[in-house]
Amino acid sequence: MGRSPCCEKEHMNKGAWTKEEDERLVSYIKSHGEGCWRSLPRAAGLLRCGKSCRLRWINYLRPDLKRGNFTHDEDELIIKLHSLLGNKWSLIAARLPGRTDNEIKNYWNTHIKRKLLSKGIDPATHRGINEAKISDLKKTKDQIVKDVSFVTKFEETDKSGDQKQNKYIRNGLVCKEERVVVEEKIGPDLNLELRISPPWQNQREISTCTASRFYMENDMECSSETVKCQTENSSSISYSSIDISSSNVGYDFLGLKTRILDFRSLEMK
C-alpha cells in the first residue's frame, strides 16, 4: 500500500506563486514555525499542496538564503565536496549555508561541469581524462591476467569419446592439447591359393594411433608433441612413435601457424 497523497488535488492552485500567497506563507511560518507541511496550507489559508509550500519556502522564501552568483570559494568547496560525496546534493548543501540542493545541482550541471571539462578533468572521477583512460585500461589488463592465472588443467571429451582436449598454462597463455585417436582394423590378406590346410584362425589386427599436438590460442605458438601408435593382434602388441615437431607448418587465413600431420606416413610395426 503506497503513501497517501499530501492533499486533494482538486480545487488547488497550480503554477506560479503570487505575491499575496508568498506573504501569507511567510507570515504563518514566522508566527507558528514550519510544523507539519500537510496541514500547513489549510491553516495558512492557502489553496496549495503541502509539497508546493515546502519547496517554495526552502528554495525562495527563507530569510537566510543567499542571492546572486556563486563565489570562487564556493566553487572550490563544491568541487571538493563532490569528489568526496558524489551527487549527494543535500549533503553538499548542508555545508554551504544559504544555498539549496536544487540550486547547487543546477549550478554544477550548467557551470562547474563545463569548467572541469575545459581543464581536461573528468567531472565524475575528478582526475585527468587521459589518466582515467589509462587507469581503466590497466584495470582491464590486470583483470585479464587474474582470470588467466586461475585457469587450471582440465579435460574435455566430446560425445563420441574419441577426441580429448587438455588445457595448460604456458608463460601466462592458455594452450590446448588435442588428442585424436584413430583406430584401424586390419584383417588378413585374401589367400587365393587353393590347397588343403588347417582351418584359418580368425586373427584380427587393430592399430590405434594417438596424436597429441598443441595449437595456438593467444596469438602465440605452443610446442607440438609426438604421435604414438599401438598395434594389437592375437599374438603380440607393438608400439611406435613419431616426433611431429618437424612436421609441415602452414598458415590459415588468419595468419596463424598450423601443423599438418599425415597419418599415412606412419609405419606400423
Curated annotation (Swiss-Prot):
Residues 9-61, 62-116 form the HTH myb-type domain. Coiled coil: none annotated. It is found in: Nucleus. GO terms for cellular component: nucleus. InterPro entries: Homeodomain-like_sf, Myb_dom, Myb_TF_plants, SANT/Myb. Disulfide bonds: none annotated. Induction: Induced by abscisic acid (ABA) and osmotic stress. Induced by salt stress. Disruption phenotype: No visible phenotype under normal growth conditions. Increased levels of flavonols. Decreased levels of anthocyanins. It comes from the Eukaryota. This is Transcription factor MYB7. The gene is MYB7.
